[in-house]
């Protein structure tokens, strides 16, 4: 939704018509009414919100489900999933202002949904929903009723019913594998139909790769030979070697060694023989073309000594002499041995000569013709030497006068094909072509020209992509990167920062420079006895901590005087909008209202940072607006005042989300230490660790949850009293029901890894997926995968955003966040996703958050991942440059266009919701139903979906974000850095890259279908992604072609110069990027190591990955105690949804309040 001034931050992405400005101005309020558009720029078939393939299908469904308490305005493009707003249905893509007691409430205010007389609503917005269908008159079509039916959210529905009709792709899979019927596959270890189909799809995909490879190979090597099929060798004039002699412009092979003592050129059945002295010369006069086109043009004189007959047929025209091929020989009429010696006029010699096949054609270039010392002309492509007319036996023959005229007319270098055009002149020209031809003009056929066109067009495209990527990557490094993050720096300072990161990344144990923490902000030491004391009231807690932490007086700050100059009327601070600034603005207005009624009363400003930590400030309110304030931990990290901006931008609350599986204590400690000690204020960050099952990693003496809980202290609830709660897992069958425990407390440092003076008091929540009682005896109870861990958080954020019913686990998560931070979960705006073996640089989180705050269009970003064990083995050494170039060339290029296609799961940040303008409207991003529903899809019945969802879930999330929000940005921030341990064994690397390569292929296929990415046609990200997809699929063939070209260039002639230059540019520009962007010359060495390993990167790894298309395991990447045993079939059993309780958080809270009241009453009694 646009702001009050009609300025939409997304407008520059939209194709607006001339009337759009007035439309925008008319849509900024609830009462603006339904928009009227004159037309749609989106094709109708792409705007049907009842189509499950529409990127915003689930968003439209969600708004329909929640129409009783959500009110959503149209977007700036007039998008509206249900235009019949007056009948009670909602409008999509916008925001509303919540109504309660005649005042506007907070954004995402979670009010009682069961109250019928007072409607609670949520401010929410989205700019991504496709546009409605409009008829020719501009009227809005009604949304189809089939799409307005609510979805039963107690169970996430399967998105599509099974269809027995075979698709074209399935038919092709069966066709290409007709030779492998089901019984044979079952005999080979694939008894299940789904497994067999995966194998068939793998074979079909490999066949497609082979087709593409064959096309590329044909264009590279076969196309030229097909359309430019000149099988004969071409030799340039004066460069004919001594193994040949030239006869009438053609080169014939001369054998100089078989017959000793030979004195002249002799012709046998298929070979010319002659002495060494004749090699490399012009022997045209030894085999003269007589009595052809020159018959009756060249005639014998009456006293001619040349044998002739009555029909003017002559035996020869010129003396039968050899001459130099460069034309330097002078006429020689001396008779040797006898007249006609060496003229080869016998029938046997002539028949033998006519039977010879020339080995090559002699050619002249136009420059050579014009600049030659010889009198050369051209006729119909033949090069004629007029100087050879001086060799005519003038005493014995008569010839046309035109011969002398041509010779003396200074026609050198001209093409006389059109001049000699009438009948007699053409006969003369053909006669000259027979007797004085010395070669052909260097020319090409139409096929050869077409071949050159294809070659150079391909060359231009490839070089354009490579060079443009290089230039843009350099531009990003010099111009964009230094302006990103918390502060703008010059290139010198940027280099220093990069060097500091390089020094830090040389070893995983190397410590980063940490700031000393104020003693009041350090962790407190508690005895077990002190953990059970009674919670203080919210106001007492605020009063207790307000001055101690930030050294400001206990007196209440009046926002009307202290922030009025900075905080705009819409809740924006210097153009930057956050939940905190908007909440502060609203509470400031409430202060004004309350103070005007009772000057002695003023709402405590500090409460603005607690969101709904107190009951409604409006007297008489009976609605539950927040959780019970008495359960808040007494020593939570106090929220700073609104004007606390240590980095020059409003702070936003961030969840640092860590997923772990089988990591050891050192790896997990490394990650949590680095996150806890980042210089981003601990008041605005929350650590959240998810342990994926009761897993004991290989070599560990404790399970992963035990290790994680050992790093917590000062628990909200004693660990032995925490109960497991149910939730809907991303799985099939009985495993769809899972249980987890939630522990909340504060991070417990190890003084040996982080000195006490550098420790911050950071809240932490650990979620342990423990599984149902039925699976406690299994190998990996509770394990559902990393995607399920992410969905726990994402689904929770969606439920909070849309005020939906939630599971018990999600309510406990909400409750624990409230207890440990004093904040409702809707205050969090970003999520930093980190793997449990990653160490983050201290200022990384600050730079990432700063970029999010400064540009609300950014929905995701990543930093640079460094390898900490560079020289551990040859396996790690070959990865160093690959990591570097993937960031500083690929991601840098994509970042300039806001379309980074892969945000690595080990270190990336996503936006939960984004401010839409500065007037209180928000766009759910990571919490968007279209993201959550598609990412939590549990129906993986095709090879494509299995590779997307089971192997490359992190990359798929990035693709899903771009697919849902193609006009928003995903960027790369090199100022933010982390380091990790790369695989040091080849089998582990092989397993890791198998997953990465296969997920890359399938994700690129998803992205190449997105038509709304930046650019158009060849100048678009869609085209670049298409090129990357083809390039990835033909990597094994490409490296084979490269090796072939290099070997061919070494051993054969002519040298393929263009191909070698192209190869040098492709391999050389990354090296040049290192020289330009890197601050360490050592990367040149790592580049050399990488180039030597190209056969591994481009052949071994992708070939292995393609052959393992149907392998969906994680292989040797993560190992557990006892080995990676196969779990039971994921589809085993049925899902009993009755075991999962779904309620609103208010209903859960009301139940909790009653339970606590009963316990209190029973205790008193």
UniProtKB/Swiss-Prot annotation:
Pfam families: Chitin_synth_2, CHS4. Glycosylated. Palmitoylated by PFA4; required for proper export from the ER. Glycans are attached at residues 303, 332. The keyword Transmembrane applies. The modification Phosphoserine is found at residue 537. Residues 74-92 have a biased composition (Polar residues). GO terms for molecular function: chitin synthase activity. GO terms for cellular component: cell periphery; cell septum; cellular bud neck; chitosome; cytoplasm; cytoplasmic vesicle membrane; endoplasmic reticulum; incipient cellular bud site. Its EC number is 2.4.1.16. The modification Phosphothreonine is found at residue 538. It is found in: Cell membrane; Bud neck; Cytoplasmic vesicle membrane. There is a cross-link at residue 136 (Glycyl lysine isopeptide (Lys-Gly) (interchain with G-Cter in ubiquitin)). Disruption phenotype: Decreases cell wall chitin level. Resistance to Calcofluor White (cell wall stressor). Decreases conjugation frequency. Homodimer. May form higher order oligomers. Seems to interact with BNI4 and SKT5 which link CHS3 to septins. Belongs to the chitin synthase family. Class IV subfamily. Present with 1510 molecules/cell in log phase SD medium. This is Chitin synthase 3. It comes from Saccharomyces cerevisiae (strain ATCC 204508 / S288c) (Baker's yeast). The lineage of its organism: Eukaryota, Fungi, Dikarya, Ascomycota, Saccharomycotina.
